[in-house]
Amino acid sequence: MLRSCFHHTRCLSLLLILCWMTDALAADFPKDFAAFQAELSPAISKKLATTPKHYRQIEPSLFHLCLDHADQLSMLSDDQRLNAIVKLAEFIDRKRELTGAAIVIGEDRTMIGLLDPARGLEPKEITTIATGYGAKPTVFKQDTATESIREVADQFLAAVGKAAAEGNPTSVVVLGHGSPEEIQSYSIPFGRLADTLINGAGTKAGKPVDLAHIVLICDDCYSADFLINLGTTIEARCRERSLGLGSLPIMIAGTNRDRVGHADFGEKFVPHFWKDVIELFYVRRPRPDAVTLRDFFEKVDNMMYGYGRAPIVQGTQVTGYRLVDPSLCQDPVFFVPLSDADLAELRTILGLPADAPLPRFLDIG
């Protein structure tokens, strides 16, 4: 009896030590982006066959992906963890390569816009660039003399639902005020937008909800948080309703997680993200035949990197950037849908069980 008690006590002590060691390892994983940059990025970038500019563009995405799985990564040895993170970076790069040619603004593509009713841009800021590429625009903005906020919100959602149902290539552009919970300018919660997309795409009997033909762009405060909530809710409601989910939409956020958006203020407020889209793909010549997702995650992202940062110049070369005002950094986010094969590959990299739940969308920088 005494031997049994001693054995039980010893096992319990070992278990407590193992738990303590696991907690200590998890606590060592960088929990903020600056620490990730300082502690892990030098070794990661050294192992990747890439340029400093390219690593800079995927670095925030890699950090957030690692942060989502920090406990799992923290249980690995230093070498194992570094190898796993490098594989995650390579996975992000493969998804960038595979999705980069997706057209966002182009010929015969429908464009649906929603503009802030008060000091937001005029419809021409979307219609002009759309028609310049042969796209077909419909823009909603409240006429305060004749329309209510709710009426315009209903009209916008009806157009989005129709686009989801018809399956024609469509880009939806929302410019205004936002929060993690809603498109504030028109009081549209992420749950209502999720239901609109599901109800539209779910009208095809016996077929899964497929939103691969839709690109959703939000240029407002907390847009990445809003789109994460939207994507997560679409997944959850499809499960609740026993609907298959073929694909989520591509989702583009003008601001990263927990970030406000910035704008140039005058008679109208001009969001920095969409301002740079107009500058790069409408004002500058020659124009491309179409504007692709790669144009967004390479060119727009690169242009916006200068907000809140100052270039470090040696001779005629920009060798890096110095952080000046973190509050001005928006660092746009580009979410792409993941297939079952993608999810299986991620689980393998992370050492997760084959049935471990993972989001069906990925931030690719």
Residue ranges and their predicted role:
Residues L2-L12:
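Bacterial N-terminal signal peptides that target proteins for export
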Residues C11-D23:
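Bacterial N-terminal signal peptides
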Residues A24-A27, A101-I103, T110-I112, L362-G365:
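Non-Sec secretion/translocation targeting segments of pathogen effectors
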Residues A27-F33:
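Cleaved targeting-peptide boundary
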Residues Q37-L40, K47-D220:
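A domain-level signal for caspase-like cysteine endopeptidase catalytic cores
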Residues I214-L350:
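Active-site-proximal C-terminal subdomain of hydrolase catalytic domains
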Residues F334, L350, P357-D363:
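Glycine-rich, flexible loop motifs
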